[in-house]
């Protein structure tokens, strides 16, 4: 039902401030779930299982991190038929993020710009939300995305990631290490060769210790930026293979404004997502696959607005895909369309 309704309600949502509309939609989706209406508004998507990173995904279309930063809306979002849901980014301590306004629509380009800044309630509240979700309890695949606090010096970033990993590990299907948001000062420095080696070494050691402690191996994925040249992609790919990282998510938002020059809000600071990032993110998927092959599975995300876009990510070397901005513009019908395009 929501597939048909969304084009009708979208103009009202787009008349609101982007962040207000975001919370309004999520709160009402969760309310519908609690009233037992999820079956009426959701997608029923046939199983099309894929095993990636040692995890069985019921279908290859997932929700990217950022839509549900605190893991508070998992059960409502599950109605859309995702094969997996990723929530976060979460940091050790609660933080407000950047001042509002911090999210902007560019409808002429089917794009968003955000400079949220990892606003979240902290990892302890995050874990409590995850533990309370029926989706996880019933076997849904749940990725937990971790980051660093804005006031943590970049030299101490490893400590924040380690702190979060230790707390989310028992509750995750996989854990994503986000080092590519442009909205936390100096964060992308962690994509540099020496910084990345240090971080991945720290987290792989912790992963093995936690696997022994909890008698369960939880895969680690790294989320990278689209604004990388060939040498950077090669260095990151080599590090992923060398450290035996289980997966990589390509990509986060871009700092480029080339595709949206002259549009209202185009010069707002932050990360650009949506249709304009499709080519850059797909280029990174293709180039990264050329480096890592099948040794490190790739989850493709960035600018997916239809089944053909999802298929292009797979053809470039991805094993799974994620959506976010396309969901804002297209609604839940996008999930069904992408799943159908990738079936079989």
Swiss-Prot record:
It catalyses: (S)-dihydroorotate + a quinone = orotate + a quinol. Its EC number is 1.3.5.2. Its cofactor is FMN. Substrate binds at residues 69, 114-118, 178, 183, 252-253. Keywords: Cell membrane, Flavoprotein, FMN, Membrane, Oxidoreductase, Pyrimidine biosynthesis. GO terms for biological process: 'de novo' pyrimidine nucleobase biosynthetic process; 'de novo' UMP biosynthetic process. InterPro entries: Aldolase_TIM, DHO_dehydrogenase, Dihydroorotate_DH_1_2, Dihydroorotate_DH_2, Dihydroorotate_DH_cat, Dihydroorotate_DH_CS. FMN binds at residues 65-69, 89, 145, 178, 223, 251, 274, 303, 324-325. The keyword 4Fe-4S does not apply. It is a peripheral membrane protein. The active site is at residue 181. The keyword Cell membrane applies. Binds 1 FMN per subunit. Pathway: Pyrimidine metabolism; UMP biosynthesis via de novo pathway; orotate from (S)-dihydroorotate (quinone route): step 1/1. It is found in: Cell membrane. CDD domains: DHOD_2_like (cd04738). It holds the Pfam family DHO_dh. GO terms for cellular component: cytoplasm; plasma membrane. GO terms for molecular function: dihydroorotate dehydrogenase (quinone) activity. Monomer. Catalyzes the conversion of dihydroorotate to orotate with quinone as electron acceptor. Belongs to the dihydroorotate dehydrogenase family. Type 2 subfamily. PANTHER family: DIHYDROOROTATE DEHYDROGENASE (QUINONE), MITOCHONDRIAL, DIHYDROOROTATE DEHYDROGENASE (QUINONE), MITOCHONDRIAL-RELATED. This is Dihydroorotate dehydrogenase (quinone). It comes from Cupriavidus necator (strain ATCC 17699 / DSM 428 / KCTC 22496 / NCIMB 10442 / H16 / Stanier 337) (Ralstonia eutropha). The lineage of its organism: Bacteria, Pseudomonadati, Pseudomonadota, Betaproteobacteria, Burkholderiales. The gene is pyrD.
